[in-house]
Structure formats: C-alpha cells, structure tokens
Amino acid sequence: MAFPIPARQLFIDGEWREPLLKNRIPIINPSTEEIIGDIPAATAEDVEVAVVAARKAFKRNKGRDWAALWSHRAKYLRAIAAKITEKKDHFVKLETLDSGKPRDEAVLDIDDVATCFEYFEYFAGQAEALDAKQKAPVTLPMERFKSHVLRQPIGVVGLISPWNYPLLMDTWKIAPALAAGCTTVLKPSELASVTCLEFGEVCNEVGLPPGVLNILTGLGPDAGAPIVSHPDIDKVAFTGSSATGSKIMASAAQLVKPVTLELGGKSPVIMFEDIDIETAVEWTLFGVFWTNGQICSATSRLLVHESIAAEFVDRMVKWTKNIKISDPFEEGCRLGPVISKGQYDKIMKFISTAKSEGATILCGGSRPEHLKKGYYIEPTIITDITTSMQIWKEEVFGPVICVKTFKTEDEAIELANDTEYGLAGAVFSKDLERCERVTKALEVGAVWVNCSQPCFVHAPWGGVKRSGFGRELGEWGIENYLNIKQVTSDISDEPWGWYKSP
C-alpha cells in the first residue's frame, strides 16, 4: 500500500536535529522487502546532546520545573492522548506499514495508547494521585518524632523499547516516566521506529516542554549502549531479549544504576481434560499467532492432557489452516510478515532444527505459496517434542507452537516450569480450584486463566527468572520511576540528652 513515510530527524530538546554524523538507516517494508524511507542513526555524540537536554529540563525553573507539580504534568499527558486520538488513522497506517502487523491489530495498539481509559489517560490520573500520596505519614513508636514519606522522580531515565509493539511499548515506558516527573531519552528499535518519531511531533504540537522527551533512533551498540553507560542517566528501562538485557544489567551495574528489564519468554499454556475444546483452541492460536507470533509472552509451549490431545490438535490444525495470511492492510488479515529478513531466517532455522532433532512439523513451517515477496511464515504447529529439543527450550519469537502431552497435574506443572524463563503462563480448566493451584505453582510473573494474552494497563506486568525483574503498568509502573525519601522530624522541645553537657 502506497503511503508516504514522513522524513524525520532526531528529536532533541523539542527540535528536529540531524544526527551529528549524518548517518541514516533504511526502512524496509516487511510485506514487500522494499526500502520505503529511512531514519536517522544516532551515535554517542547525539546521546550526549540529548542527555544534556533532558537534565536541563529536569532542573529548569526551580519550583516550577517539570518535576515539581504532578497535576501540571497530567494536563500534558491528557493532551497527548487527545492528539493521538485525533491522528489515529495516520499512526495506524504507519505502524502497519513499518512493522507488518495486521491493520486490525495496529488499530487496537493505537487505541490502547490514546483512549481515555488507557495508557496516557491512566497515568495522568496516577500523576494526580501522587499529589495525595505526598507526605504520607509513617507511624512511629516514639511520640517525640514524626515521619513522612516523599515520592520524588528518579531523574533522567533511558528508555529502550522493542519492535513488536513499537508505539505501544514506548508508551508503557514514556507515560509512567513522565507522570512520575522524570525526563527521558528514548531509543526505539531501529527495525520499527516510524511511529516513535511521529510521537515527537505530537509532543511538539501539545507544547511539551523542550527536553522532557528526547527520541534517538539508531542501532543498539551505537545509540542504546551509550544511553545505558552514560553517568547522567539515572535509570534504564528495557524491553527486549534476555541476552541484551544481561548486557544492559552488567553495564548499568558499573554505576550502580537501577534497571527494569522485561525480557524473553517461553510461556506454557496448559489444557486440562475438562475444557471446551473450541474455545480453548481459539485462545491457543491467539496466544501464539497474535502480532505474527512476535510476542515476548507468547504461550508457545502447549501442554495438553493426553486424553484430549488427538482431538485438540486436530481442531487446532483446522483452525490454523483457516487463518488469513496476507498483506497486513487487507481486510480480515490475521497474520502478516515477521519484522525482518534476519528474523525470518532465524525462525526458519528453528523449524529446520526441530525437524532434524526428530520433531514433526504437523502444520505450516514454510513460506505461504501465494506470497512470493515479504517475510511471511505459515503458522506452524510442531509435535513429537522432547524437553531436550531447542524448540522446547529457546524463544522463537515467531508464529510457531510446540505441543507436548501430560498425564497428571503435577506433571503439567513440572513441564511448564521446565524453562529458564518466567514471563507468563496460561491454564485452562473448568475446575477453578485446580486453576488456582496451578496458578500458584507456575514460576511466572503473569498467569491467564481460561484465556491468553489479555493485558490491561491497570495490572502489573513483568517476569521472573531470565524474563527479567521490575514491574511495568498500573501503580507499580509509576513507582519504577520514583525515589522514596524518608523525612523524620524531632517535634519535642526537650534536648535529646544522650551526651553530657559540657
């Protein structure tokens, strides 16, 4: 679909600025493999300029600065929500074109960013609620002292976001950081930065103070790493692979810098024998093929009770073959291309390795015959799995699900927890007591019961084990960007009397 990509520069201190080294990165449409534009490539020199701008914005006009008044910030967040709603169709087109996700999904993503009950509007309310929490009293055992708590913004934060939900994942970080009073330097993925740059224009249009949000597109080693290691960045929040997260954690540790990491996953979905098969099959497909399979929390390890496995898998194959794979702008598209040639090759290698290790490719596993161009992969179901196989252990980040059977509840839990990851999991059963037992036993940060993937801004999001730590969203998300300060006062007129007066 022909749709012009706006030509943008880096967004620094409220202005569009050419990168100091003047380099650009091509934008490739994953549906056609064609170059459709380019984005600026920031380097350490640009990071320095952006951090200075963010620090200046954080300190500007003492008493009336960005960090001072919670309600002052809330009005900007609401203005951003309104402006994105106004430009919704523009953002949807760009997101679909740049990322390859079906247009219907892009609509939902942009709605989540903008609508009054979601991200910016929600965190605007959180910003106002923080006014009420300031100076919250602390009960002490000694009457001569009184104590209260202050919540203050951490400072300048570095935000590094992924390519699977470009603007939405940016919003998960930007909204709470700004609501908390921080100023920010954002580095989106070079594979999908277009809507993130357009967000800078929205900030200008609503009059966001210069330097509060700075947007640097570029490669991880050139732009992301300098953000993490910069001594004037007070915190880093990252969403991406566990391998990159480990490097960020190691770099930040040199300065004892706090980090929030939302990393990879290999999430299980457990199907007990009492389920409604048709309902459960649809949720299973949604849990792994949504966003073209590129979901950190994808429930890509299906554990199904042996008594219903044959029927369940048969219905799953039929449902899967009915999924419309097409150009993401086509009406009814439910699976588009993966993000890049590199990702396409990686996923196909996973499928090839699974076959060589003895697994069966029951459905899919190759390029759709009717799509000769673009990074399209058929939704793939793999059976005859052993727990030693790569496909069982490693995150694929594509439209691939592996299937294994179990006999007992204990075996299902053991198999579900047989992973170094712990982002999410799902359990399906009409026995809600069993669901509660399994929920408590799963070593994950989020559990879905009789569904997969619904995510709401009001609930915490994050993982355990190698899926990271810290929580985004809800009141937990804004606390990520606040320092807690204890203030204790002596309210007695009597001397302390510990030392003898000379």
UniProtKB/Swiss-Prot annotation:
Coiled coil: none annotated. Its main location: plastid. It comes from the Eukaryota. GO terms for molecular function: aminobutyraldehyde dehydrogenase (NAD+) activity; betaine-aldehyde dehydrogenase (NAD+) activity. NAD(+) binds at G240, S241, S242, A243, T244, G245. Residues 1-7 form a transit peptide. Keywords: Chloroplast, NAD, Oxidoreductase, Plastid, Transit peptide. The active site is at E262, C296. It is found in: Plastid, Chloroplast. Gene3D superfamilies: Aldehyde Dehydrogenase, Chain A, domain 1, Aldehyde Dehydrogenase, Chain A, domain 2. One of its GO terms (biological process) is glycine betaine biosynthetic process from choline. GO terms for cellular component: chloroplast. The record marks N164 as: Transition state stabilizer. Transmembrane segments: none annotated. Pathway: Amine and polyamine biosynthesis; betaine biosynthesis via choline pathway; betaine from betaine aldehyde: step 1/1. Homodimer. Belongs to the aldehyde dehydrogenase family. This is Betaine aldehyde dehydrogenase, chloroplastic. It comes from Atriplex hortensis.
